[in-house]
Amino acid sequence: MSAQQSQSRKTTTAIRQAKGPGKVVALTAYTAPMARQLDPHADLLLVGDSLGMVVYGLPSTLGVTLDMMIAHGAAVVRGSTQACVVVDLPFGSYQASPMQAFESAARVLAETGAQAVKLEGGVEMAETVQFLTARGVPVVSHIGLMPQQVNTVGGYKAQGMQADGSERILRDAQALQEAGAFALVVECTAEAVGRRVTEALQIPVIGIGASPACDGQILVTEDMLGMSGARVPRFVKQYAQLGDEIGRAAQRYAQDVRAGAFPAPEHCFGVQAKA
């Protein structure tokens, strides 16, 4: 990355200071071509462990490895120049101890060029967040529905629907802010919970199925673009149907190949005459 590119990229400080005056625009990205398209429009690009399901067809995020995250994180950094790039720490790469988390995060930052890491967990991860931030690792925390804990909570269900769950999420949010997280993702909660957390914190709260009151929003880009099949979460708004368009393009290509219409003369190289 050139010095000019580095200077133009949004920093974690800029994201932290976005609390209040506007909305943080965040999307997922897993590849350089997609990052290139999203970069002019997004404040933050998240290389999420959702890539396990979106890119690799895994049934959950649990099979994603640190090496996978690093490879895709580096690709997104290479494909972008403006957005702040944040990379998820995958399941099993940070839960054992704060030192394990630091070693994983250090690899991510050093090998990708990303600006920060994201990790799931509430009060129980506050010590780890504090350990990381004290050692120069910027952290985005993630609470509410936490996909890495899907087996513990019994599936992908909205969180904070009861009073005790609402209070737990608020305690998680406050503990993570105190630990030094510069932003917080709140996923799939009751709307009132997302609103309450946003109002209670001084750091930006980025919602995904949380509340329009959040300081920003994030979606899985392939869901937003209509590339994820028929079923998408209720909180997703689809702004295109690129899956259908890709299918139609592939159909036209197949028809041309089978009919001998492609490649046409304009797609072929002629033999050059000797001078």
Swiss-Prot record:
<dbReference type="InterPro" id="IPR015813">
    <property type="entry name" value="Pyrv/PenolPyrv_kinase-like_dom"/>
</dbReference>
<dbReference type="Pfam" id="PF02548">
    <property type="entry name" value="Pantoate_transf"/>
</dbReference>
<dbReference type="GO" id="GO:0015940">
    <property type="term" value="P:pantothenate biosynthetic process"/>
</dbReference>
<dbReference type="InterPro" id="IPR040442">
    <property type="entry name" value="Pyrv_kinase-like_dom_sf"/>
</dbReference>
<keyword id="KW-0460">Magnesium</keyword>
<feature type="binding site">
    <location>
        <position position="49"/>
    </location>
    <ligand>
        <name>Mg(2+)</name>
    </ligand>
</feature>
<keyword id="KW-0566">Pantothenate biosynthesis</keyword>
<keyword id="KW-0963">Cytoplasm</keyword>
<feature type="active site" description="Proton acceptor">
    <location>
        <position position="187"/>
    </location>
</feature>
<feature type="binding site">
    <location>
        <position position="88"/>
    </location>
    <ligand>
        <name>3-methyl-2-oxobutanoate</name>
    </ligand>
</feature>
<comment type="subunit">
    <text>Homodecamer; pentamer of dimers.</text>
</comment>
<comment type="function">
    <text>Catalyzes the reversible reaction in which hydroxymethyl group from 5,10-methylenetetrahydrofolate is transferred onto alpha-ketoisovalerate to form ketopantoate.</text>
</comment>
<feature type="binding site">
    <location>
        <position position="88"/>
    </location>
    <ligand>
        <name>Mg(2+)</name>
    </ligand>
</feature>
<dbReference type="GO" id="GO:0005737">
    <property type="term" value="C:cytoplasm"/>
</dbReference>
<dbReference type="GO" id="GO:0003864">
    <property type="term" value="F:3-methyl-2-oxobutanoate hydroxymethyltransferase activity"/>
</dbReference>
<feature type="binding site">
    <location>
        <position position="120"/>
    </location>
    <ligand>
        <name>Mg(2+)</name>
    </ligand>
</feature>
<protein>
    <recommendedName>
        <fullName>3-methyl-2-oxobutanoate hydroxymethyltransferase</fullName>
        <ecNumber>2.1.2.11</ecNumber>
    </recommendedName>
</protein>
<comment type="pathway">
    <text>Cofactor biosynthesis; (R)-pantothenate biosynthesis; (R)-pantoate from 3-methyl-2-oxobutanoate: step 1/2.</text>
</comment>
<dbReference type="GO" id="GO:0000287">
    <property type="term" value="F:magnesium ion binding"/>
</dbReference>
<keyword id="KW-0479">Metal-binding</keyword>
<feature type="binding site">
    <location>
        <position position="118"/>
    </location>
    <ligand>
        <name>3-methyl-2-oxobutanoate</name>
    </ligand>
</feature>
<dbReference type="InterPro" id="IPR003700">
    <property type="entry name" value="Pantoate_hydroxy_MeTrfase"/>
</dbReference>
<feature type="binding site">
    <location>
        <begin position="49"/>
        <end position="50"/>
    </location>
    <ligand>
        <name>3-methyl-2-oxobutanoate</name>
    </ligand>
</feature>
<keyword id="KW-0808">Transferase</keyword>
<comment type="similarity">
    <text>Belongs to the PanB family.</text>
</comment>
